[in-house]
Amino acid sequence: MKILVTGGCGFIGSNFVRYILNKYPDYEIVNIDALTYAGNPENLRDIREDKRYRFVHGRIEDKNLVANALGDADYIVNFAAETHVDRSIRNSSPFLTANILGTHVLLEAVRTGSIKKFVHISTDEVYGALGSKGKFTEKTMLAPNSPYSASKASADLLIRAYYETYRLPTVIVRPSNNYGYYQFPEKFIPLMITNLLMKKPIPIYGKGENVRDWCFIEDSCAAIDNVMHNGKAGEVYNAGGNCEVENIELAKSILKIMGKSERHIKFVKDRPGHDYRYALDNSKIKRELKWRPSVKIEEGLEMTIRWYKDNEWWWKPLKERLSAESRGFWER
């Protein structure tokens, strides 16, 4: 079995590549990645020499590159995307190019090829914001509130149109917030962990009352694997972690695990269009595909913190580069 993975040097993508190669000894993966600021080949240092893995440097907007890399692949799993909300607020152009035009190129490749399934990794942010009650279902109307989420929602609608028009074997996965190993240190959880390891304060937007639904990366990889093999064409699957936590409470949990006081918290001005709450109803994927998250937040945070403590070689150069670029981004 052969899989074309796009964006496989990013956070979720690299964990998925490793997950698949570890689980399926006879699978092969071709990984296309543009190696933009968050794409890091060091994420896959341990499998570079694996004969089942091949890396292709390039952008998914490049039709010829995609066609050549696709070859006789059985599946495409599309992680390639610009994903940071704050960066999209400052400059949305890269998000439109990668997230919409890039998806279009992949869909055209599927339309003219013989792919068994095209799996697109979306986000819970396409649904917009929730109040204090209720959860997003797969039938919730899309109502994105940032340039980033608008670009992802646009890609989702394009995929829907290609399924309805051409009956392509497409499926969409909408995960909740992921956390775990190899996550770029501008994101909320690794930002807090690495700041504390460097004896720096941890910035929290507003009063820290925003709520996110968290899912450990290995659970998310298992969900995507399940959808790839068993998901029904034309469907959307919410892969939520069933773990809603206020940002401030999450920060306090990390401080407690790391033995730090709450004096390290620094409240900062809230960002524009900051969605109050995300929460995914994952009953469909549990019912139809028998997937459910297995790692509790306490266990996941402990494993994640331990990983960052043990892998300073990986995150410290990225952190220094962010500092040099004067990037003041703190949360997805």
Predicted regions and their residues:
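C-terminal substrate-binding subdomain of Rossmann-fold SDR/epimerase-dehydratase oxidoreductases
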Residues: 15-17, 29, 58, 196-332
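Residues in well-ordered alpha-helical elements
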Residues: 64-67, 86, 93, 104, ...
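The catalytic Tyr-centered alpha-helix of NAD(P)H-dependent dehydrogenases
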Residues: 140, 144-151, 181, 185-189, ...
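Hydrophobic alpha-helix immediately C-terminal to the catalytic Tyr-X-X-X-Lys motif of short-chain
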Residues: 154, 158, 162, 192, ...
